[in-house]
Amino acid sequence: MNRSDGLVRRSVKPRENGGAEGGLNANTPDDNQDALDNLKDQEDNIDDGDSKETRLTLMEEVLLLGLKDKEGYTSFWNDCISSGLRGCILIELGLRGRVMIEKSGMRRRGLCTRKLILKSDQQTGDVLLDEALKHIKETDPPETVQSWIEYLSGETWNPLKLRYQLKNVRERLAKNLVEKGVLTTEKQNFLLFDMTTHPLSDNVVKCRLVKKIQDSVLSKWVNDPQRMDKRMLALIFLAHASDVIENAFAPLNDDDYEVAMKRVRELLDLDFEAESAKPNANEILWAVFMAFTK
């Protein structure tokens, strides 16, 4: 991998800022609060000049880590990335203020038994997220995070829940990355059939992603999950759950690799229930983490 550093500039449309301001002035209090939540989410997720980079969702970042640069497809042996991408979708919806975990109540129910409930049905503009949001909105009674990961993956024995499966997720995410200029599209022949692949076309974007993950557990390690950027914390967990985090650490020397993996294991060994109960914790994150480690 070419580890050269750089910036990928994107145009910032003036109407986006203007639209946000106009919405705050003209809409109802609920709309205003939602707009404020969205703006706060963007501020939380953009640091160190990320506004000048190609913006990727958690799903796109995990898929990009899993794709082979030249071949343009994920490992045939990776059977974890499918459910991992569904976990990304739930966390994205949580970070964008669309869903939340119900309150623990007087009985202090655990994360794994509490339901995922709708917070706002305002569309995100991302087709996959909005499709999942629609399913969550139409489901009554609500389901747990673990159940939703299974339903969205199509890994359920309940035939009535198969309609919730999100289909062709990897291909749809790859097309998003093609539109953003990160990947390209090719046809490759595999003996008896042709296969659409998506080789890397912008090495800078992937290098920045890999470096960002490496820095989070090395030079920028804070040793406190509550102080970590929530999106980066989610990316580390979900990359591990999707069995692609090794691709981010492969370029490291032996000493740095050992330190990085040790710190990832420290995160995996946390008490998720205790972390979710701390002030300002995002319960969606910890509920998804628990679903993948139970």
UniProtKB/Swiss-Prot annotation:
Region Beta-hairpin required for oligomerization: start-end pairs: 186-197
GO molecular function: cargo adaptor activity; phosphatidic acid binding; phosphatidylinositol-3-phosphate binding; phosphatidylinositol-4-phosphate binding; phosphatidylinositol-5-phosphate binding; small GTPase binding
Predominant cellular place of this UniProt entry's protein: Golgi
Keywords: Cytoplasmic vesicle, Golgi apparatus, Lipid-binding, Membrane, Phosphoprotein, Protein transport, Transport
Presence of the UniProt keyword Membrane in the record: yes
UniProt-annotated binding residues for a 1,2-diacyl-sn-glycero-3-phospho-(1D-myo-inositol 4-phosphate): 77, 86, 167, 170
Spans annotated as Disordered: 1-52
Location of this chain's protein in the cell: Golgi apparatus membrane; Cytoplasmic vesicle; Cleavage furrow
Cellular component, GO, one term: Golgi cisterna
One GO term (biological process): spindle assembly involved in male meiosis
Membrane topology: Peripheral membrane protein
Disulphide bridges, residue numbers: none
Impact reported for residue 170 to L: Prevents binding to PI(4)P and abolishes sau localization to the Golgi membranes and cleavage furrow
Superkingdom per UniProt: Eukaryota
Biased composition (Basic and acidic residues): 37-52
Consequence of gene loss (knockout): Lethal. Embryos display an aberrant pattern of denticles with some additional dorsalization and twisting. It is associated with a defect in heparan sulfate proteoglycan synthesis which in turn alters hedgehog signaling.
Subunit structure: Homooligomer. Interacts with botv, Ext2 and ttv. Interacts with Vti1. Interacts with Vps35, Rab5, Chc, Rab11, zip, Pav and Septin1.
Family, as annotated: Belongs to the GOLPH3/VPS74 family.
Function: Phosphatidylinositol-4-phosphate-binding protein that links Golgi membranes to the cytoskeleton and may participate in the tensile force required for vesicle budding from the Golgi. Thereby, may play a role in Golgi membrane trafficking and could indirectly give its flattened shape to the Golgi apparatus. May also bind to the coatomer to regulate Golgi membrane trafficking. May play a role in anterograde transport from the Golgi to the plasma membrane and regulate secretion. Also involved in the control of the localization of Golgi enzymes through interaction with their cytoplasmic part.
UniProt protein name: Golgi phosphoprotein 3 homolog sauron
Species whose genome carries this gene: Drosophila melanogaster (Fruit fly)
Lineage: Eukaryota, Metazoa, Ecdysozoa, Arthropoda, Hexapoda
